[in-house]
C-alpha cells in the first residue's frame, strides 16, 4: 500500500517551484516527495522482482539501513574510450490509441526532451571532446507489470581523454546528478528543489 503525500504540503512545494519557473530561474524541474510504502516484501525481494534495466540494492551493515533503486535509463556508459548517455524524457501508455504518434507529436514532451538532451550534451562536454547527439528522440518500449509504456530517448556521446581510467570518479562527479531527474539549468534547479523539499 502506498500512502498519498499530504496534498497541502505538496501544493506549497509545487508553488515554490512554479514561482521560480515563472521568474525564469528554471525552465524544467522534477519535483518529488517522500511517500510511505507499506509492503510485505523485503528490499531484497523488491530488488529481485524489479524489472528495471538497472537495479541496485545497497546495504549499510553499520546502521542496518537499505536502499533499493531500479531504472530503465542508461545514465552513463563508458566503452573503448567513449562516454555515452541516454537521457529519457517523454512517456505514454503504449495501449492508448495511436500512442506513438501522440507522444512524438506532443510539443511539451518534445521541448522537455530537447532541454534535457542539451543539458546532458553540455555535461558530457565537461569531461569529453567531440560531443555529439548520435540519435535524437527515438522510442523505447518499457515492459512493466502494469503493461507496456513508450519512452523517448536520445544517444549522446563524446571521446574521453587519454588516461580517463584513472579519473572515473571525477568524470561521474562532473555528471551527477543526472539532468533528466533534476531539471534545467541543473545547479539552480537543484537549489530550487532543495528549497521546496
Where are these regions (language model features)?
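Extended alpha-helical targeting/anchoring segments
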Residues: 1-197
Amino acid at each position: 500500500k502506498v500512502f498519498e503525500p499530504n496534498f497541502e504540503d505538496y501544493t506549497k512545494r509545487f508553488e515554490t517551484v512554479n514561482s521560480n519557473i515563472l521568474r525564469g530561474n528554471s525552465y524544467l524541474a522534477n519535483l518529488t516527495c517522500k511517500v510511505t510504502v507499506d509492503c510485505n516484501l523485503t528490499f531484497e525481494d523488491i530488488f529481485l522482482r524489479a524489472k528495471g534495466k538497472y537495479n541496485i540494492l545497497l546495504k549499510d551493515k553499520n546502521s542496518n539501513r537499505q536502499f533499493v533503486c531500479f531504472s530503465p535509463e542508461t545514465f552513463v556508459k563508458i566503452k573503448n574510450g567513449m562516454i555515452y548517455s541516454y537521457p529519457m524524457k517523454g512517456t505514454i501508455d503504449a495501449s492508448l490509441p495511436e500512442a506513438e504518434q501522440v507522444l512524438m507529436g506532443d510539443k511539451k514532451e518534445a521541448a522537455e526532451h530537447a532541454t534535457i538532451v542539451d543539458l546532458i550534451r553540455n555535461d558530457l562536454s565537461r569531461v569529453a571532446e567531440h560531443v555529439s547527439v548520435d540519435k535524437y528522440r527515438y522510442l523505447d518500449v518499457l515492459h512493466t507489470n502494469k503493461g507496456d509504456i513508450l519512452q523517448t530517448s536520445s544517444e549522446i556521446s563524446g571521446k574521453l581523454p587519454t588516461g580517463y581510467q584513472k579519473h572515473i570518479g571525477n568524470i561521474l562527479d562532473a555528471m551527477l546528478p543526472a539532468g533528466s531527474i533534476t531539471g534545467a539549468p541543473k545547479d539552480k534547479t537543484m537549489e530550487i528543489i532543495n528549497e521546496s523539499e
